[in-house]
Amino acid sequence: MRTRCVIWEIAASRIRYGYRRIYVALRREGMVVNHKRVRRLYREEGLNLRIKRPRRHVSAAHRTERAPATAPNQIWSMDFVSDALFDGRRLRALTLLDVFTREALAIEADKGITGEQVAAILDAVLTTRSAPQRIRVDNGPEFVSNALDRWAYEHGVTLDFSRPGRPIDNAFVESFNGRLREECLNAHWFLSLDDARAKIEAWRRFYNESRPHSALGDRTPHEFASLAGVNPGQ
């Protein structure tokens, strides 16, 4: 009975968790439970997620992948997510990730973000991290701006641009943005820009500190970063 109640509590607070993530969360809380039992209880309670998976194009499936990151601060990835306040005013959020540790290094929301602001956000991150070798970006105007080009030159960073019209070239950050939208942006009303910033930052901290990632051996990004010799930033 207690296991069933805890499963309900986790599912209610983390609406995009399937039974596998709930099983990991239970284990992290010290509960000894079989994953098959978690799956059975999850289904009995009608908590099944219904996810429509996108159809993968053959050309994308056969694309030669970029070399994977093998160390922290080797490859970062950057992109934008758009959303709105409760009154319809638009906002944009810059997402910045370490591809190896899966850490969300920054999620900065504003009404609009220029190339100069992108450079300033990167400078702020460099107060706690070393500069990466490469940053993967798309061909958006903020990323092809003179301000970011100059920043990259001054810090010895290569800007690795995606091919136009090929979001799969930066698939990791696209996947992260999907989680951000499902677990945060779609779960809240933002009453103001400050309210949006506070809720997005709270989710970023949860993602880094408390959300286990299957690709990291069910560790959180901060736990994995610590094992890799990085002192996780704020």
Describe each region flagged by the PLM.
Residues M1-Q234:
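Charged DNA-binding/catalytic regions of mobile-element recombinases
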